Curated annotation (Swiss-Prot):
Part of the 50S ribosomal subunit. This is Large ribosomal subunit protein uL22. Keywords: Ribonucleoprotein, Ribosomal protein, RNA-binding, rRNA-binding. The keyword Transmembrane does not apply. GO terms for biological process: translation. The keyword Ribosomal protein applies. It comes from the Bacteria.
């Protein structure tokens, strides 16, 4: 049994989120939540919500036991960027891309 949860368009770059995702890949969900709770990174809070959603999906839809669940797969894909401009000298402007990502978490036995 595998249950999935997806967060689309998270307003953080995929590169920063992958650092957190790599730390919890393959861990039991209780240890993964512990790691995410004490991580100082912004991405940890976002990933924690997705993991909790996947656990809730497994409980509600499949009747799974939380103690047996572990993180089967977690991956982070790049999403659309918001294009913005910032003012520069002599009336010029530079483009800034505000990155976003899609976070997918799969939990199972």
């Amino acid at each position: 049994m595998e249950v999935k949860a997806i967060h689309r368009g998270a307003r953080i770059s995929a590169q920063k989120t992958r650092l957190v995702a790599d730390q919890i890949r393959g861990l039991p969900v209780d240890k993964a939540l512990n790691v995410l709770t004490f991580s100082p990174k912004k991405a940890a809070g976002i990933v924690k919500k997705v993991v909790l959603s996947a656990i809730a999906n497994a409980e509600h839809n499949e009747g799974a036991d939380i103690d047996e669940l572990k993180i089967k797969s977690i991956y982070v894909d790049k999403a659309a960027s918001l294009k913005r401009f910032t003012a520069r000298a002599k009336g010029r402007g530079n483009r800034i891309e505000k990155q976003s990502c899609h976070i997918t978490v799969t939990v199972g036995n």
